[in-house]
């Protein structure tokens, strides 16, 4: 689960992490009042959306008067911001964050993520702050410093000092930096975060480290332990189809392609998307229906996929382990009666009773449902049908 920058900074403040003073505005008048209250000579006006790259897209601007802050907020509020992390439609701006300007001496990057290969959290830092860390990793990988933290030991001052020395911090900065990292890691662990990212982390003219921007994402599976985090959820930032899928225990993520995918198991779902791309197509979604693949579940999956007007064909890829393929085949036919499936459906079933399942689909003789002989053949057929605009 993602939260907004202003919410992330409120959490950081609770853990003693330095942040600039600021306030949230939903109207231009509120933005003007907040700037007046903060005082100073310059303010940053930041669009609040769940996506990075706001600065390049015009979602972060500076104002030199409170009145200008209101004018900038007026232009941002209600507009749609398109960044490299949004869809082509972008995200509508409902709130802006008005923040005091700071005297900045140096910018850094600091982040905490789980390294699955090491099976432990890793703190990453870089002297190249304020830029896209993915670009730094691609173009200057040596500029990223990584320190793994054994969860059996936890974060210790020596971890912070190792990062500080690698960043070339001055002697008087090291202790401040270690304290900053200690607080950040405590938040990461106690709130069950997946990512805590400060970009940029700045050292100010007042000689302190401050989180100038912040991104925090949380583990959905741990949200039951954090009702205070759940209360921060902004449904307007999420795809309505993804919210609906969650209500039926379906894992759905909307993508930009035209081949709908319905698969059981997250690993198989990712492999299915890969083979669709390998065959020259583009997946329209990630959809994991789980282990059951019951008629109601399949029907709801079809319904959600077909809400995307870009979908021109659907590839159903089910591996029958515990669930029998013949039951899945009957479930697909029952689902087709419940939901009007307006595009061709290619079905690949493998595993327990796969032969019987293929016979069931072939005997049903439904014009737009095709039994695929293999994973490769199914993906190729789905891509071909999608390229034909769904014509079977």
From Swiss-Prot:
Its EC number is 6.2.1.5. The keyword Metal-binding applies. Gene3D superfamilies: ATP-grasp fold, A domain, ATP-grasp fold, B domain, Succinyl-CoA synthetase domains. Pathway: Carbohydrate metabolism; tricarboxylic acid cycle; succinate from succinyl-CoA (ligase route): step 1/1. One of its GO terms (cellular component) is cytosol. It catalyses: succinate + ATP + CoA = succinyl-CoA + ADP + phosphate; GTP + succinate + CoA = succinyl-CoA + GDP + phosphate. Its cofactor is Mg(2+). Substrate binds at residues 264, 321-323. GO terms for biological process: succinyl-CoA metabolic process; tricarboxylic acid cycle. Keywords: ATP-binding, Ligase, Magnesium, Metal-binding, Nucleotide-binding, Tricarboxylic acid cycle. ATP binds at residues 46, 53-55, 99, 102, 107. InterPro entries: ATP-grasp, ATP-grasp_succ-CoA_synth-type, ATP_grasp_subdomain_1, Succ-CoA_synthase_bsu_CS, SUCC_ACL_C, Succ_CoA_ligase-like_bsu, Succinyl-CoA_synth-like. It comes from the Bacteria. GO terms for molecular function: ATP binding; magnesium ion binding; succinate-CoA ligase (ADP-forming) activity; succinate-CoA ligase (GDP-forming) activity. Binds 1 Mg(2+) ion per subunit. Succinyl-CoA synthetase functions in the citric acid cycle (TCA), coupling the hydrolysis of succinyl-CoA to the synthesis of either ATP or GTP and thus represents the only step of substrate-level phosphorylation in the TCA. The beta subunit provides nucleotide specificity of the enzyme and binds the substrate succinate, while the binding sites for coenzyme A and phosphate are found in the alpha subunit. Heterotetramer of two alpha and two beta subunits. Belongs to the succinate/malate CoA ligase beta subunit family. This is Succinate--CoA ligase [ADP-forming] subunit beta. It comes from Wolinella succinogenes (strain ATCC 29543 / DSM 1740 / CCUG 13145 / JCM 31913 / LMG 7466 / NCTC 11488 / FDC 602W). The gene is sucC.
């Amino acid at each position: 689960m993602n939260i907004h920058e202003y919410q992330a900074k409120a959490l950081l403040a609770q853990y003693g992490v330095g942040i600039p003073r600021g306030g949230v505005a939903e109207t231009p008048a509120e933005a003007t009042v907040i700037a007046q209250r903060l005082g100073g000579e310059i303010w940053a006006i930041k669009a609040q959306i769940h996506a990075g790259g706001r600065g390049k897209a015009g979602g972060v601007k500076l104002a030199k008067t409170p009145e200008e802050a209101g004018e900038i907020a007026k232009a941002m509020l209600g507009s749609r911001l398109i960044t490299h992390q949004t869809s082509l439609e972008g995200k509508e701006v409902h709130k802006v964050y008005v923040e005091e300007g700071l005297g900045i001496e140096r910018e850094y990057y600091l982040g905490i993520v789980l390294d699955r290969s090491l099976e432990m959290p890793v703190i990453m830092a870089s002297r190249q702050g304020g830029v896209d860390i993915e670009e730094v990793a691609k173009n200057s990988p040596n500029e990223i410093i990584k320190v793994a933290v054994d969860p059996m030991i936890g974060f210790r001052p020596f971890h912070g000092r190792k990062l500080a020395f690698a960043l070339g911090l001055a002697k008087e900065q090291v202790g401040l930096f270690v304290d900053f990292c200690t607080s950040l890691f405590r938040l990461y662990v106690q709130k069950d975060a997946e990512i805590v990212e400060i970009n940029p982390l700045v050292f100010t003219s007042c000689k302190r480290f401050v989180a100038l921007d912040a991104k925090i994402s949380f583990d959905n599976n741990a949200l039951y332990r954090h009702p205070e985090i759940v209360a921060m959820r902004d449904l307007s930032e999420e795809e309505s189809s993804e919210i609906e899928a969650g209500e039926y225990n379906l894992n759905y993520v909307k993508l930009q392609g035209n081949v709908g995918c319905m698969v059981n198991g997250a690993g198989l779902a990712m492999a299915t998307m890969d083979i669709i791309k390998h065959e020259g197509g583009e997946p329209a979604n990630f959809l994991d229906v789980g282990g059951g693949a019951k008629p109601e579940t399949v029907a709801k999956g079809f319904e959600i996929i077909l809400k995307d007007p870009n979908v021109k064909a659907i590839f159903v890829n089910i591996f029958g382990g515990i669930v029998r393929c013949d039951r899945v085949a009957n479930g697909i036919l029952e689902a087709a009666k419940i939901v009007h499936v307006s595009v061709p459906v290619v079905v690949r079933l493998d595993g327990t009773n796969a032969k019987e399942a293929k016979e069931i689909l072939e005997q049903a003789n439904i014009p737009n449902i095709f039994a695929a002989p293999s994973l490769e053949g199914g993906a190729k057929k789905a891509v071909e049908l999608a390229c034909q605009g769904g014509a079977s």
